[in-house]
Each structure stands twice: as C-alpha cells, then as structure tokens.
Amino acid sequence: MAKIIDGKAIAAKIRGEITAEVAKLAAQGITPGLAVVLVGEDPASKVYVSMKEKACKDVGIFSDEYKLPAETTEEELLQLIDKLNKDRKIHGILVQLPLPKQINTEKVLEAISPEKDADGFHPYNVGRLVIGKPLFQPCTPYGVMVMLKETGVDLAGKEVVVVGRSNIVGKPVAFMCLQQNATVTLCHSKTRDLAAKVAMADVVIAAVGQPEMIKGAWIKKGAVVIDVGVNRVGEKKLVGDVEYEAASARASAITPVPGGVGPMTITMLLYNTLESAKRR
C-alpha cells in the first residue's frame, strides 16, 4: 500500500513556520495584511472566504473582508481594487472567483498590483513563473510542489504527467516541475491514449475535476500520485480525479481526498501574503 501524503500535517507544519515569521515582523511593527473580496452570494465562495479569514487569524495575519452585492458593477470593483493597491496596510489582495457575469474576470485580475497578487494569477506573475523568476506563485500548484518536497520526492530526471491544463493548476504546476528538471507531459481533453501517458509517469498530478477519471490500473508501480481534484458524488461523498483505492495498491505515495492538496492551498496563500509583507 502507498504511503499517504498527509496534506493537513504538512500544512500545519508550514503554518507553524508562518506564525513564527509573522511574530518576528510584528516585533518590527509590521503586520501582514490580506484583503479578500467576495462579490455575490455563491455558497461555496462564502465557505472558502470564511476559511481564509480563520486561517489568517490563526497565524496572526490581518484580514480585511469586502463582501459586495451580486449586482456590483465592474467599475465599482475596479475602484475598490485601486484603493486596495494603494493601501499600505494591505500586502495581498485576493478576489474570490467566480465573479458575476457582468464582470470581466481577466480585467479584474489584471487590475490587481502584481506586487499584491497573492493568488499569483496576474499575467506579470505568470510570465515571471514561466521564465523561472517567480514573484508570487499560484497557491494550489505551489502547495503541490511543497508537498512533493516535504515527501522527499526529487523531480530531477523524473517523468511527470500533469492531467489538466487549467491556468489555475495544470499549466503553472507543469512549469514548476520543469524548473525542478523534470520531463513534463501535459495532458488534456484532446490527448490520445491518456492511459498510456499516465502509465509512463514517475509522478502523476491530476487536476481535471472529473471524479475518478484516472484509473488505478494506469498507475505505474512505485509512482507518486498527487490528486488535486475534489468532486462531490451524491449527497456527501467527496472523491478525487484518481481511483484512490486501486491507485493506492500500485503507487509508492498518494494524496487522499479530502485531506491532501486542499489544506495546502490556503496555507500557500498565507505564505504569499507573508512574503509580500517581508518585501516591503
């Protein structure tokens, strides 16, 4: 059976380090500040925002929440972002996605100052990531890389197969693996013979949002499996993008769902906010 990569335990360790760093800054009169902007009443978004608020409080980061009505105009949101860009108490800005349809998401993300882009989605930060000189790295893929490092996985020379090419996870994590000298294959909906691609991987990173799409039988014996997917099946069951039980029988290490990558995402958001405050 595979070793379980415990995201909760790794996140707790990193948060302990963040708490200590925040306390050091506080002794110098600096409190890292994160502004979280929520537009509308999306239930999942409200849950995520409250989790981020609690996480900030737990490590000593100042959290400023802006909850705007669903009918907020694009111009009103851009004005708020401009104000937050100029606010010296704020070191990180996060706009919770998805946004209502009357607001252009791309325009909003581009309006955030690259130096306060705690989510790492600004084109400037994406470009820096691609050339190997990152300022902010997107939180979920960053969390994946930290998990691999903490598990003792050296990517140099390894075959890494990333399934899913989203701008939020798939593409950035592929570039991050490339910078660690892995040989990366990025698979997507038009990829031919996905099973054969996955079967050659030393490390599989699944981020497609399709319940148990990647079959356990595809996994090479001894491979490491990182499952970013969180999919609801029925009323209460959560599953990943990988067939967990069958994959566990073949993999050397695997992340569970829930309790794997999820806890790392908010942890890396806290880390990005801390790093921004240290740069000031």
From Swiss-Prot:
NADP(+) binds at G164, R165, S166, S189, V230. InterPro entries: Aminoacid_DH-like_N_sf (IPR046346), NAD(P)-bd_dom_sf (IPR036291), THF_DH/CycHdrlase (IPR000672), THF_DH/CycHdrlase_cat_dom (IPR020630), THF_DH/CycHdrlase_CS (IPR020867), THF_DH/CycHdrlase_NAD-bd_dom (IPR020631). Transmembrane segments: none annotated. One of its GO terms (cellular component) is cytosol. Its EC number is 1.5.1.5, 3.5.4.9. Pfam families: THF_DHG_CYH, THF_DHG_CYH_C. GO terms for molecular function: methenyltetrahydrofolate cyclohydrolase activity; methylenetetrahydrofolate dehydrogenase (NADP+) activity. Disulfide bonds: none annotated. It catalyses: (6R)-5,10-methylene-5,6,7,8-tetrahydrofolate + NADP(+) = (6R)-5,10-methenyltetrahydrofolate + NADPH; (6R)-5,10-methenyltetrahydrofolate + H2O = (6R)-10-formyltetrahydrofolate + H(+). Keywords: Amino-acid biosynthesis, Histidine biosynthesis, Hydrolase, Methionine biosynthesis, Multifunctional enzyme, NADP, One-carbon metabolism, Oxidoreductase, Purine biosynthesis. One of its GO terms (biological process) is tetrahydrofolate interconversion. PROSITE patterns: THF_DHG_CYH_1 (PS00766), THF_DHG_CYH_2 (PS00767). Pathway: One-carbon metabolism; tetrahydrofolate interconversion. Homodimer. HAMAP family: THF_DHG_CYH. Catalyzes the oxidation of 5,10-methylenetetrahydrofolate to 5,10-methenyltetrahydrofolate and then the hydrolysis of 5,10-methenyltetrahydrofolate to 10-formyltetrahydrofolate. Belongs to the tetrahydrofolate dehydrogenase/cyclohydrolase family. NCBIfam families: PRK10792.1 (NF008058), PRK14186.1 (NF010783), PRK14188.1 (NF010785). This is Bifunctional protein FolD. It comes from Geotalea daltonii (strain DSM 22248 / JCM 15807 / FRC-32). The lineage of its organism: Bacteria, Pseudomonadati, Thermodesulfobacteriota, Desulfuromonadia, Geobacterales.
